[in-house]
Amino acid sequence: MDEDVLTTLKILIIGESGVGKSSLLLRFTDDTFDPELAATIGVDFKVKTISVDGNKAKLAIWDTAGQERFRTLTPSYYRGAQGVILVYDVTRRDTFVKLDNWLNELETYCTRNDIVNMLVGNKIDKENREVDRNEGLKFARKHSMLFIEASAKTCDGVQCAFEELVEKIIQTPGLWESENQNKGVKLSHREESRGGGACGGYCSVL
């Protein structure tokens, strides 16, 4: 690991098929958007290093297929994850209703009890909304999750989602400090004195 990188974090993106998980990932890592992007087969994987409040973190981001036939990949996919982005489509209520199923899966297979979860309502650029923002916020509060609405197409909220998730993980040293205890790394003073969220009105730390 690079000396100036605080830690490497495993981040998962989960949710029903077609909610835009891969599009969010590609917008964040490559700043691209493909409206004809094919459904993920199995698991996709990308790496990106970001800086949050003076601390560099290398993100290993896992994007999984939402289809039921790929669920045999689940146990290894969740193992060792420090953060999860749970995505639904604000124009498809069925993807919101099924969030409980994904949370149950997360609780079943996740190996950490202090993992940081972020709920993302994607596709806010579309007009045919079926899930109100307050519904998403209420669900996130109920399950102690971070929350944001976003659009992979317009880039709205995408960077914020990942940065807020990483910030919260870094503020939870138990998630990563054991991996770095022999490297002498520590948080920057900016992070130690960190107050509110970096994304203004977008994210709610709950």
Curated annotation (Swiss-Prot):
GO molecular function, one term: GDP binding
Motif Switch 1 mapped to chain: 31-45
Binding positions (Mg(2+)): 22, 40
GO biological process, one term: import into nucleus
Residues linked to a lipid group, S-geranylgeranyl cysteine type: 203
Modified residues (N-acetylmethionine): 1
Key words of the record: Acetylation, Cell membrane, Developmental protein, Endoplasmic reticulum, Golgi apparatus, GTP-binding, Hydrolase, Lipid droplet, Lipoprotein, Magnesium, Membrane, Metal-binding, Methylation, Nucleotide-binding, Palmitate, Phosphoprotein, Prenylation, Protein transport, Transport
Motif Switch 2, residue range(s) on this chain: 63-80
Function summary: The small GTPases Rab are key regulators of intracellular membrane trafficking, from the formation of transport vesicles to their fusion with membranes. Rabs cycle between an inactive GDP-bound form and an active GTP-bound form that is able to recruit to membranes different sets of downstream effectors directly responsible for vesicle formation, movement, tethering and fusion. RAB18 is required for the localization of ZFYVE1 to lipid droplets and for its function in mediating the formation of endoplasmic reticulum-lipid droplets (ER-LD) contacts.
Family from the record: Belongs to the small GTPase superfamily. Rab family.
Protein name per the record: Ras-related protein Rab-18
Organism: Mus musculus (Mouse)
Annotated gene: Rab18
